[in-house]
From Swiss-Prot:
Record-given protein name: Protein FAM199X
InterPro entries named in the record: FAM199X_fam
Coiled-coil boundaries: 317-346
Positions with biased composition (Basic residues): 315-334
PANTHER family: PROTEIN FAM199X
Residue ranges of the region described as Disordered: 238-343
Cited Pfam families: FAM199X (PF15814)
Keyword match Coiled coil: yes
Keyword entries, A-Z: Coiled coil
Upper taxonomic lineage: Eukaryota, Metazoa, Chordata, Craniata, Vertebrata
Length: 374
C-alpha cells in the first residue's frame, strides 16, 4: 500500500471524508447508515460471543439504530462501504471530535456493552490478521480486521470427578469427615425405615451403651466420636441379620439417587415411594409386585409397633398428670389445716376447749319424735 494511502487513512485532510461523501452527517453528530453495509466481525476463539449465532453479525438490520462507542487506540471498527475501493477503518485520534455512531438502547449498543463487559481491551494482546489482502502488491483494499483474543478467563474448566468408594466396605477410621456424615445419614434412614422399635434400640445400645432413652424421646442423636471400627462392624452385622429378607437391600447409591430425586431427606414416605419406583424400573413386574407387598408388610409392622409405643407414652403421661394433681390437692389441704391451727393458737379463744363425743344407740332411734315447737 502506498504512502499516500497511509496518510489518507491515518490523517485525512477533512474530518471523516467517508461520512461527508456517503452519509448524511447532521449537527447532532448522528450517522445515517441506510446507504452503508456495516458489518461487525466477531472475534474468533471467543466463547461468550457464540450467542451471535454466526461468525459475522450484520448491522444493516439495525437501520439507523447503532450503538454508542468510542474506538480506543487498540480497537478498530471495521466498516465496509458499498464498493471496496472506498473502504476505510476509522481510527479514533484524541484530537478528533468524538461523535455518537450508535445511540443508546439499540441492539448494537447491547453488543458493544457485551464486548466491553467480557474483556478489558487495554490489557489484551491482539494478533491482527488481514485475510484476503496483499500489502506487497500495493492493494488499497482493507479486508475485515479480525482480532485474535485470548480465551475468556471466566470459563471454568470442568473438575474431574473423584473415584467412587464403596462406604459399606470401608472401616470407620478410613472414611473422611464428609463420608462419615453421609454414611451416618444413610444408616439412620435405613434403620428407621426397615426396622422396628426394638431393633432401633438395640443398635443405639451398640453405638452408645451408656445412652439413656426416655419414653418421651422421639429421636436419638448419634455423635461421630461414639463410633469406632468395631462398633460399626457390629452395627453392619446386626443390620444384615435383622433386616427383612423379603425386602431388597437398599444400597448407598440407590439411597443417594432417591434423595436427589425427591430433593429432601426428611420424608420417610417419600423415600419409600422412590425406592419402590427404582425396584419396579430395574426388575420385572412380578418381582416388583412382590417387593412392594413385602415393603408394605414391613412398613405396616413398623407402624404397628410405633402406634403401640405412642399409646403407652400417652397413658404414662396421663397417669403422671393425675398423680401430680392428687399430690397438689393433698399439699393444699395440709397447708390449709396448718394455717387454721396457727390462727387458733394465736387467738387464745380455744385454750379451754373441750371436745365432747356423742354416741347414739339404735334403741333411741325408735323413740317417739319430740316436737320442739311445743
Amino acid at each position: 500500500m502506498s504512502e499516500g494511502v497511509y496518510e489518507k487513512f491515518l490523517a485525512p485532510e477533512e474530518p471523516f471524508p467517508l461520512l461527508s461523501q456517503r452519509g448524511n452527517f447532521s449537527e447532532d453528530a448522528t450517522l445515517d447508515v441506510s446507504d452503508f453495509g456495516c458489518q461487525l466481525s466477531s472475534c474468533h476463539r471467543t466463547d461468550p460471543l457464540h450467542r451471535f449465532h454466526s461468525s459475522r453479525w450484520n448491522l444493516t438490520s439495525c437501520g439507523t439504530s447503532v450503538a454508542s462507542s468510542e474506538c480506543s487506540e487498540e480497537l478498530f471498527s471495521s466498516v465496509s462501504v458499498g464498493d471496496q475501493d472506498d473502504c476505510y477503518s476509522l481510527l479514533d485520534d484524541q484530537e478528533l471530535t468524538s461523535f455518537d455512531l450508535f445511540p443508546e438502547g439499540s441492539v448494537c449498543s447491547d453488543v458493544s456493552s457485551s464486548i466491553s463487559t467480557y474483556w478489558d481491551w487495554s490489557d489484551s494482546e491482539f494478533e491482527w490478521q488481514l485475510p484476503g489482502s496483499d500489502i506487497a502488491s500495493g492493494s488499497d483494499v482493507l479486508s475485515d480486521i479480525i482480532p485474535s483474543v485470548p480465551s475468556s478467563p471466566c470459563l471454568v474448566s470442568k473438575r474431574k470427578s473423584k473415584p467412587h468408594r464403596n462406604l459399606d466396605e470401608l472401616p470407620w477410621s478410613a472414611m473422611t469427615n464428609d463420608e462419615q456424615v453421609e454414611y451416618i445419614e444413610y444408616l439412620s434412614r435405613k434403620v428407621s425405615t426397615e426396622m422396628g422399635l426394638r431393633e432401633q434400640l438395640d443398635i443405639i445400645k451398640i453405638i452408645d451403651p451408656s445412652a439413656q432413652i426416655l419414653p418421651t424421646d422421639s429421636e436419638f442423636i448419634i455423635e461421630l466420636n461414639c463410633l469406632t471400627d468395631e462398633k460399626l462392624k457390629q452395627v453392619r452385622s446386626y443390620i444384615r441379620e435383622h433386616s427383612p429378607r423379603q425386602r431388597p437391600n437398599i444400597t448407598r447409591d440407590n439411597w443417594k439417587r432417591s434423595m436427589a430425586s425427591n430433593g429432601s431427606t426428611s420424608g420417610v414416605s417419600a423415600h419409600s415411594s422412590s425406592n419402590a419406583s427404582m425396584v419396579s424400573s430395574t426388575s420385572s413386574s412380578t418381582a416388583s409386585t412382590g417387593s412392594n407387598s413385602s415393603t408394605n408388610i414391613s412398613r405396616a409392622h413398623s407402624d404397628g409397633n410405633l402406634a403401640t409405643a405412642a399409646e403407652r407414652i400417652r397413658d404414662s403421661k396421663k397417669r403422671s398428670k393425675q398423680r401430680k394433681m392428687q399430690q397438689k390437692a393433698l399439699r393444699k389441704r395440709q397447708l390449709k389445716e396448718q394455717r387454721q391451727a396457727r390462727k387458733e393458737r394465736l387467738s387464745g379463744l380455744f385454750m379451754n376447749e373441750e371436745v365432747l363425743s356423742l354416741k347414739v344407740t339404735e334403741e333411741e332411734d325408735h323413740c317417739d319424735d319430740v316436737d320442739v315447737l311445743m
